[in-house]
Amino acid sequence: FLYHAESIQESMTVNSSTMVKEFTNPLKEPIDDDINLFDFLDRRAQRDPDGSTVEYKADGGWKSFSATQFRDLVIALGKGLIGLGVKKGDAVSIVSRTRWEWTALDMAIMAVGALTVPVYETNSDAQVSWIFNDSQATIAFAEDDGQRDKIESIHDEVQSLRKVFVIDAGALEALQAYGKEVSDEEFWARKNDAHGDDLATIVYTSGSTGTPKGVELSHRNLAFLCLSAMQYMPRACAWPDRRLLLFLPLSHVFARFMELLSFCGTLTLGLSSDMKTIVKDFESFGPTLLLAVPRVFEKVYNAASQRAGKGIAGKMFLRAADVARDWSKAEQAGEKLPWRGRLAHGFYELVVYKKIRTIFGPNADFAITGGAPMDANLSHFFNGIGMPLLEGYGMTETCGPVCVSLPENNRIGTIGMPMSGVTAGIADDGELCVRGHLVCRGYHNHPDVTAEQIVDGWLHTGDLGDIDEDGFISITGRKKDLIITAGGKNVSPGLLEAAVMTSPVVNQCLVIGDRKPFVAALVTFCLLYTSPSPRDR
């Protein structure tokens, strides 16, 4: 999420650390990021022990954990990991959709100094085998029997794997049983031994070669970005009564960042992965901010247009959309619409705009979007109806957002300013580079790629960009041959083209899909003749 470039790709060129433009958004106050990420949850329990902290769907409604309840659960799970023999630096994998158990296990793993290795439930057997072997995973938590069977099918290929738990089969209860003989003192000693520059997680992301690379993120990396966000965007995460419905995969680094930011700040974290009920979940949970890729908002706009139809209602919707865009463009220019435009905007607020906003629940006042370039017309439409879409940019290698627009300072067409304490630069070849404590330690088992992509502290993003005099960043292109779909997925066209062209009937193949909700291909075919005579062809 918030990702124009989800991963760094290998390159044959040597990156330069010379910047022709540079902008730093200074911290408002010093940050102490030499902590264990569990400290965020522990501090939340101390300052708001009974407040709802994690909520999940059950029995037709929402159930909740208070901060104290969730912290105590995480401690019990951490003791279980210690009792199971998990050592500091061991890799523990979670193969599951987003659910509250994922978050509890993640916090427990990191609390005792082990490394969380997320795996998408959609990953193939071969991908799981690669990730487990590269990270040397010792324990795995599978969501259900299907994920367990996937892991068991490659168990013989992974010598490091000692035990597999199934979440749906009582994994958390079983893990807690291993910790019954582990003292509180032993847990806190392990917690205090892991902090700052110790690894917290290895997040695997595919590159242009298609081979997953593990991005090493430390407790300091993630803690810094959370504390930076508290300074940079307090309205999102530090104001009272803030609520976040997280339906993104927790295997994605941005979802993990938001999980931790919830504990660091004041957010109540709602967890759901059922996209079929997401509109009902918006209504019942009532998030105060939304997180989604541009494709989600495209679907909302298209659905509203289709419901209006082609008659009078359809014409009214098109006119309402034009007025919303005009209103937004005038606001961006620091102007007001003429009185007729203001009158029309007020009318459409009652009959069109308000109805669209209700899709996102009763409390949402803005949305953060990224993962793919945002169409400016769509941004102006939603801004004009009172639901600003704040575009941002980030990478797995930066733990989450590098920059994001703010409700009070939103320049449509840019990806906002750098987060607090983050420096952005433009290299002499136009590449956007990033520096700060949010930059990963490097690539697991790939020191050569690390040395190539992180030069003198500068992370080379592979994207071309510009920075204006106020520090707002724009993406102007990409150095790499990589397609990013409207849903934020990175697709390497070369791999697909090569696979298609293995067919004897295919002459040429060109994969397309940038900014589209699909990936397609233009294909030219060979004519295969069975007769040697041109006259008979």
Regions flagged by a language model, labelled:
Residues F1, T205, Y529-D536:
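Conserved small/polar residues in nucleotide/adenosyl-binding loops
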Residues S11-M12, L84, A111-A177:
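Structural core segment of the AMP-binding/adenylate-forming
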Residues P49-S52, V166, K180-Y204, T211, ...:
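Conserved pre-ATP/AMP-binding loop-to-beta segment of ANL
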Residues T53-M107, S124-S129, Q176-K180, R220:
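Conserved AMP-binding/adenylate-forming core of the ANL superfamily
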Residues S64-T68, A200-C226:
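Conserved AMP-binding A3 loop
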Residues G146-G196, A304-K355:
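ANL superfamily adenylate-forming
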Residues A223-L246, L250-Y353, N363:
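Conserved AMP-binding/adenylation subdomain of ANL enzymes
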Residues P418-T485, T502:
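Conserved ATP-binding/catalytic segment of the ANL
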